[in-house]
Amino acid sequence: MYNESLRDQKEVVLCEDGTHTLFSIEFDEPYHSTKDGALHESLEKHVKPALVLSKDKTNLTILDICFGLGYNTFSTLHYIQTQGLNTKVHILSPEFDEGLVRSLDTFDFPPEFDSIKHIIKSISQDLYYEDEQFKIEILLGDARKSIPNIQEKVDIIYQDAFSPVHNPLLWTTEH
């Protein structure tokens, strides 16, 4: 199903909101809606709805299915910081493209992420970040294998893999 020979073939795409995303040759689609934009999509479709429903929690565990460029994770941190929330967050994120994660410290992220550049750098180098408020772990490999090994209770799930048409393995009911 997956074609590893195409994994490194990606093209940078400028979205209508001015943010950048990538187009995956392997999955024949962009990582984000080029019309909505990467940041807008992450905030409006994933982060804000999830955090509004969890606003009274002081600790959250989030499963960000398919880390990719990290927009959902980084938008979560950005939102928590800009809203002045004291929520402690642990994010677990499966990702099979280690090369992509390791390249994130050179990706052209929006200025909204300037305050978390040190986090992006740590994740790209160590696949991990932790401070008193945020803990982020990248689970390298197939999400179908890493997710069953998660021991803690997950409060929020960002299901943001490539579309069911192009990545049906992550949209089945058996996983």
How would you name each of these model-derived features?
Residues 2-58, 69-85:
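Class I SAM-dependent methyltransferase Rossmann-like catalytic core
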Residues 42-46, 142, 175:
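Well-ordered alpha-helical segments embedded in enzymatic catalytic cores
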Residues 52-152, 158, 170-173:
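The AdoMet/dcAdoMet-binding core of the Class I SAM-like
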Residues 160-162:
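Cell-envelope and extracellular/periplasmic
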Residues 165-166:
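Short glycine-rich, flexible loops that bind phosphorylated cofactors or substrates
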